[in-house]
């Protein structure tokens, strides 16, 4: 999987639904044939989808995987209203109007040796995309992926065969696909799922970071996507250990192309605090610049 340099041009295309698999708790994994978007998508990008001809407002959906070879993108979503319910009824071969890829993705120029990827809930898909990107485009990196969910994970899990000395031995649940790629992962939940850390994903991240020595910790950079409160905790964790941290924010969006300014957040810039649009100025920002995380 290779991706050219991110472009600001947005493409409107009629994507064809290739497959759609249902998982527990009304979670769905769809694969769309979308040549223009797949050619340009990077981890952190999203698409704006028309869920049904009778539903005026589009829905923003983060991209979980992108294949230039197959001209496809993967979307993972949960039914949470009329729009996503309409998506769940789509059949193989149906056409879905989408705009993409949108936004500023994760910056991947100066990777440190130990990228720590933290995803929670609907923020899991971009983290999977980033993990795959690191695997396919870099060498000598050792990413560690942590994912938390309070509903059953919408993918195959298994006890990990990759030992992590800094994590309790009984915390061994991993994402099978990441394990196949040779990427270390651990899962967390408050629901006592087998092998999962019984707590918040940031708590397990703290345990891991605390047990690293100073030299190891200097090689860590955090990339995260998830609910606002989780990202706030991730930001505090980065500050505690003096780590670089990029976060992908979640906000309600109307136009998703920068026109309505309905998804603005206060960001610290060189010129002072400014309102930035999550859709096009983000969704990825440096955690230390997000004002709401430091109040």
Map each language-model feature to its residues.
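FNR/FR-type flavoprotein reductase catalytic core
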Residues: 85-247
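A charged, well-structured terminal subsegment
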Residues: 282-295
């Amino acid at each position: 999987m290779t991706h050219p340099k991110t472009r600001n041009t947005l493409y409107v295309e009629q994507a064809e639904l290739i497959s759609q698999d249902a998982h527990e708790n009304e979670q769905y994994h769809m694969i769309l044939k979308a040549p223009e978007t797949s050619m340009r998508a990077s981890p952190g990008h999203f698409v704006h989808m028309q869920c049904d001809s009778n539903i005026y407002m589009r829905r923003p959906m983060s991209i979980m995987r992108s294949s230039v070879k197959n001209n496809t993108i993967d979307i993972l979503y949960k039914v949470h209203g009329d729009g996503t319910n309409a998506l769940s009824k789509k059949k193989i071969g149906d056409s879905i109007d989408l705009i993409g890829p949108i936004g500023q993705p994760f910056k991947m120029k100066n990777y440190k040796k130990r990228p720590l990827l933290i995803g929670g809930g609907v923020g899991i898909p971009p983290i999977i995309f980033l993990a795959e990107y690191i695997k396919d485009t870099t060498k000598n990196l050792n990413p560690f992926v942590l994912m938390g969910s309070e509903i059953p994970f919408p993918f195959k899990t298994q006890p990990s065969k990759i030992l992590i000395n800094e994590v309790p031995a009984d915390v061994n649940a991993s994402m099978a696909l990441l394990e196949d790629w040779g990427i270390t992962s651990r899962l967390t939940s408050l629901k006592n799922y087998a092998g999962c850390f019984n707590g918040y994903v940031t708590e397990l991240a703290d345990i891991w970071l605390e047990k690293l020595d100073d030299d190891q910790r200097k090689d860590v950079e955090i990339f995260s996507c998830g609910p606002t409160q989780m990202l706030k905790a991730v930001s505090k964790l980065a500050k505690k250990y003096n780590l670089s941290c990029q976060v992908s924010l979640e906000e309600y969006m109307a136009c998703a192309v920068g026109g309505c300014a309905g998804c603005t957040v206060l960001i610290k810039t060189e010129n002072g605090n400014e309102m930035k649009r999550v859709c096009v100025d983000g969704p990825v920002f440096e955690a230390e610049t997000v004002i709401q995380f430091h109040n």
